[in-house]
Design a protein with these regions (language model features):
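Active-site anion-handling motifs in enzyme catalytic cores
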Residues: 1-329
Length: 329
């Protein structure tokens, strides 16, 4: 009996960011396969989030041992020099073994010139079966990389992934106005919130009668600044101290690791009347669920704003993106 050659997916999976696993779900729908595997640094967690995976691999050697028919390189912000240096050589080998290579829905970082690529590595990109990025900023950044192949724009197709409501049904009250809150506790965001506290307090006056739904999409394995539980707790303490929390268990990290998935998170967001978010893939969830979204971000970091621009033709009524100034130094 002939063995099925699987599709393998490369991305920043397993690190504790549900936005990346959301991109994996979308990629698996875009490239359906009888057997699909994904790279992950935490296979059990990734497979809980994406149960239709056949399995995970931890390195390029394990990927090549699967003898894939297709390699889908994506997973959100995987378009960086570091990621290319780590994986492009293995894509050359996979292509030589007969695999088709796809670059799908990339978020492109500050790449710089990719002149260090060998001719074979460059051809993997230039001859890819598909090459897409998620927004026009990614196109502009890619144009500076010195590669002749230019990508098409997807406009965050993961916005259309279906929500799962089991957790929302179990945890959230009915008949109560709900505000979802998602804040990343980076030093820059903390400084901006302190500096523009009066602006944020004025913004929060509208929500005095709302219960709070903590929207935690990331508890990173190794980066404390990427812990949304800490960001949410601090924001509620400073700006919404009198509002009840509709589901305090969502701030429990162990519960989060055991129960949250990308689609369950979208189910929580879909039940909110408004989502206040610093994190872009929560904005993507909210926009996809037709929930009013207020983006709040440091003005110097435009990643959230570019998400709003990419999805501007489908923003729910009343949505807006607010940039906060940092203190001058």
């Amino acid at each position: 009996m002939m063995r099925i050659r699987p599709t393998v997916h490369l991305g920043a999976f397993g690190y504790g960011n549900l936005g990346d696993e959301l991109c994996l779900i979308e990629a698996m729908q875009a490239f359906p396969s009888a057997e699909a595997y994904a790279f992950s640094v935490a296979p059990d967690w990734t497979m809980r989030c994406v149960p239709c995976l056949k399995g995970c691999f931890r390195n390029a050697g394990e990927m090549l041992a699967l003898k894939p028919a297709r390699v889908v390189y994506g997973g959100g912000l995987f378009g960086t020099s570091k990621a290319f240096q780590a994986w492009i050589p293995s894509l050359v080998r996979a292509k030589a073994m007969g695999a088709e290579v796809y670059f799908h829905n990339l978020g492109v970082g500050a790449l710089g010139d990719l002149g260090w690529l060998s001719a074979a590595e460059r051809s993997v990109i230039e001859d890819a079966a598909i090459f897409t990025v998620r927004d026009y900023v990614s196109v502009e950044r890619w144009a500076k990389a010195g590669i002749s192949r230019m990508p098409y724009v997807t406009h965050f197709p993961e916005a259309d992934i279906a929500p799962e409501f089991s957790l929302a049904d179990a945890l959230l009250p009915r008949g109560q106005r709900l505000l979802g809150v998602s804040i990343i506790p980076t030093p820059m965001m903390r400084a901006c919130l302190r500096h523009e506290a009066a602006t944020v307090h004025a913004l929060m006056e509208e929500f005095s009668d709302h219960a709070i739904v903590p929207i935690v999409s990331t508890v990173h394995l190794s980066t404390p600044d990427e812990d949304d539980t800490a960001g949410c707790i601090e924001f509620l303490r400073d700006f919404l101290p009198k509002n009840p929390i509709a589901a305090p268990i969502l701030l429990d990290r162990e519960f989060w690791r055991a129960e949250l998935t990308p689609q369950r998170l979208k189910g929580l967001i879909a039940r909110c009347d408004t989502l206040l978010t610093h994190r872009k893939h929560n904005a993507v969830h909210g926009i996809g669920a037709n929930v009013r979204v207020i983006g709040l971000h440091p003005w110097a970091d435009g990643s959230l704003r570019r998400t709003f621009i990419a999805l501007s033709d489908r923003l729910p009524h009343g949505s807006r993106c607010i940039g906060l100034q940092a203190p001058s130094t």
